[in-house]
Amino acid sequence: MGRAFEYRKATKLKRWGNMARTFTRIGKQIAIAVKAGGPDPENNPHLRAVVATAKRENMPKDNVERAIKNAMGKDQKDYKEMNYEGYGPFGIAVFVETATDNTTRTVANVRSVFNKFGGTLGTSGSLDFMFSWKSMFTITKKEGVDMDDLILELIDYGVEEEYDEDEDEITLYGDPKSFAQIQKYLEENGFEVKGAEFTRIPNDEKDLTPEQRATIDKMVERLEEDEDVQNVYTNMKPADNEGEE
């Protein structure tokens, strides 16, 4: 397994611990996708990808359909995707992705958490160089498929040679700009796409003591308690026992 897998697995275990929070996060993604491309998943690849992620995370079908219906309503809030970047304690880089209908409220809340933990909120783009932004596709294993051949077919779309493999799933990483092309190829070639989203992987990780790690975990948890926050990424190296089953 690659470094991206270990980082993603460890952070996912924390991030998806609260089911209600997960459904709220996906609901906002559905609203953004519907506003951009319409309510029909068949004609809206972005929405189709979000619905696949909702299914993987066990979000009830009724909830998904209700979120799509609500997104078409005239009273639906207009969410804006905003990123906030800065440093937490111990020099750890913290990248916060949000979807908000009130940026003034959101930046105040995010800054408050940074201040509480002795961190500093920086300017937009200040941490771009510290993280690699990737498209990420989780597909069901398909009998008779040679992974080397599949990667070769997708290499023009920026899909990386290194991939993650679980018992019945494979996760591919690619160029974010080629998200739609990768999704189209996988669907047209009969792959079951169980999740399609974007992620950020730290280019270098910083090791901490258990006590320092606990402080960063608390900071991330506090950030994720804000309903506007979609994802929180750090360059903290996962503990040796994190990411294991």
Swiss-Prot record:
Indicate where this protein is primarily found: cytoplasm
Location in the cell: Cytoplasm
- One Pfam family named in its UniProt record: TACO1_YebC_N
- Keyword Signal present in the record's keywords: the answer is no
| Superkingdom, natural source | Bacteria
Give this protein's Gene Ontology molecular function annotations.
Answer: DNA binding
Q: Keyword Oxidoreductase: yes or no?
A: no
Which terms are listed as keywords in the entry?
A: Cytoplasm, DNA-binding, Transcription, Transcription regulation
SUPFAM superfamilies with a match to the protein in the record: YebC-like (SSF75625)
> What GO CC terms are in its UniProt record?
cytosol
Residue ranges for the region (Disordered) are 225-245
Single biological process term from Gene Ontology: regulation of DNA-templated transcription
Matches recorded under PANTHER family = TRANSCRIPTIONAL REGULATORY PROTEIN YEBC-RELATED (PTHR12532:SF6), TRANSLATIONAL ACTIVATOR OF CYTOCHROME C OXIDASE 1 (PTHR12532)
Entry's family note? Belongs to the TACO1 family.
Q: Any idea what this protein is called?
A: Probable transcriptional regulatory protein BF2589
